[in-house]
């Protein structure tokens, strides 16, 4: 049976296709990694556990993890700021130098500058930055101490360390504590500042002393809380004129004027009856900014220091073996007599055969104990010579005491005590013990 034309055409086409060779193989092009994708995070994201779990809780946990990790897949480039040209930068520096040179006056012929420097005062002409810092200092003092930041407390402390009348009498620790309590007061021209309740530092303006109990600080004072000024224009209350019949109110001359950084007042807390009779005051010649350190605040700091020292002494004596069962009241009687003292390494505290002059309680360090013995040394001539030597017997350690029997019974020491390294101890001198 003859085939139709259509099937024959299809058959011939299929035969022709089978005879045609397959097309050549081509390699798959490499994929370029994107610079904006973190492929390590992407790989971790694709292998999160629980994505294909049948448990609903696992699926939700995997979904939360996926959503948290997803933003890490994309890299965020940091924005780059345009570079500055060196020429412009150099030009700005040169302009700044020229301006500072023009602004700073020539003080070579200014006698006031040399006088100020000779008395240890502040230089009259300061860079612009110092002026800005001083204005910042004034603004901080206007705040209540409780509202100041740690940075502001540190700024006040740094300025207090530049005032000679304060650093002469107060250590750095006291100044740091006081810096958190000081404040500034504004006084109008013609005001009378009564300074019986604190120590004052003039920050702006002029003031004139007006009192019958002033004494120039450059002459000194025996009072433990008074200040010996390094500046001529500083005055302080003096006990020497307390009962003086020659004392009278007066206004000093212009040479005694108190200016910037001048100090006056006292850190002693005066009794009420004395503060009423002994007026300690200045009169402002301008509108003044005056820093005040309250005497009561300083007294509180001293009380806290004494309490801490007494607690340290009590703890030291309590830890010494012979005082563990002593009543507290008896120990407090000893605390009133204790003084701190340091000894360098190799210092002979007491020699054998001598009576020691104090009772010691070792707070830090240690001492070696030696016994003096007589030995015999054979010489080349077959003769024997007597020789005295120190033999090590032991040591005194921290939280141990010595010298009680020698001081109380006036018995000589049978050994020699030498410090091995620096030793700090609390001591009671024999003269204080016998008086007590």
UniProtKB/Swiss-Prot annotation:
CDD domains: CAP_ED. A nucleoside 3',5'-cyclic phosphate binds at residues 322-436. SUPFAM superfamilies: cAMP-binding domain-like. Residues 89-108 are annotated as: Disordered. Disulfide bonds: none annotated. It comes from the Eukaryota. Pfam families: cNMP_binding (PF00027). Gene3D superfamilies: Jelly Rolls. Residues 89-105 have a biased composition (Basic and acidic residues). PANTHER family: CYCLIC NUCLEOTIDE-BINDING DOMAIN CONTAINING PROTEIN, CYCLIC NUCLEOTIDE-BINDING DOMAIN-CONTAINING PROTEIN 1. This is Cyclic nucleotide-binding domain-containing protein 1. It comes from Homo sapiens (Human). The gene is CNBD1.
């Amino acid at each position: 049976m003859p085939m139709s034309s259509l099937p024959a055409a299809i058959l011939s086409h299929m035969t022709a296709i089978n005879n045609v060779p397959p097309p050549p193989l081509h390699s798959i092009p490499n994929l370029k990694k994107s610079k904006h994708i973190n492929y390590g995070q992407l790989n971790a994201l694709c292998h999160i556990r629980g994505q294909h779990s049948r448990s609903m809780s696992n699926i939700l946990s995997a979904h939360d993890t996926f959503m948290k990790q997803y933003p890490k897949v994309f890299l965020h480039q940091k924005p780059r700021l345009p570079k500055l040209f060196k020429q412009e930068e150099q030009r700005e520096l040169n302009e700044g130098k020229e301006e500072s040179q023009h602004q700073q006056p020539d003080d070579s012929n200014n006698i006031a500058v040399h006088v100020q420097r000779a008395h240890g005062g502040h230089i009259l002409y300061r860079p612009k930055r110092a002026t800005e810092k001083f204005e910042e200092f004034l603004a901080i003092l206007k705040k209540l101490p409780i509202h100041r930041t740690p940075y502001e407390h540190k700024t006040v402390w740094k300025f207090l360390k530049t005032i000679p009348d304060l650093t002469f009498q107060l250590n750095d620790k006291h100044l740091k504590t006081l810096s958190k309590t000081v404040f500034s007061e504004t006084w109008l021209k013609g005001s009378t500042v009564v300074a019986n309740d604190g120590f004052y530092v003039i920050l702006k303006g002029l003031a004139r002393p007006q009192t019958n109990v002033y004494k120039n600080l450059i002459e000194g004072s025996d009072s433990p809380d008074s200040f010996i000024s390094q500046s001529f224009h500083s005055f302080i209350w003096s006990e020497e004129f307390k009962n003086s019949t020659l004392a009278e109110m007066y206004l000093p001359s212009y040479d005694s004027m108190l200016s910037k950084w001048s100090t006056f007042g006292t850190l002693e807390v005066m009794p009420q009856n004395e503060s009423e009779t002994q007026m300690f005051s200045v009169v402002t010649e301008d509108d003044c900014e005056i820093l005040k350190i309250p005497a009561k605040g300083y007294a509180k700091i001293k009380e806290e220091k004494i309490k801490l020292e007494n607690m340290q002494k009590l703890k030291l004596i309590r830890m010494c073996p012979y005082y563990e069962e002593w009543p507290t009241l008896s120990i407090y009687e000893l605390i009133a007599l204790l003084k701190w003292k340091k000894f360098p390494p190799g210092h002979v505290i007491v020699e054998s055969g001598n009576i020691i002059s104090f009772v010691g309680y070792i707070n830090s360090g240690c001492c070696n104990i030696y016994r003096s013995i007589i030995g015999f040394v054979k010489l080349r001539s077959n003769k024997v010579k007597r020789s005295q030597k120190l033999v090590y017997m032991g040591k005194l350690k921290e939280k141990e005491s010595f010298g009680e029997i020698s001081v109380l019974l006036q018995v000589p020491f049978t050994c020699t005590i030498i410090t091995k390294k620096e030793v700090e101890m609390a001591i009671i001198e024999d003269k204080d013990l016998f008086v007590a």
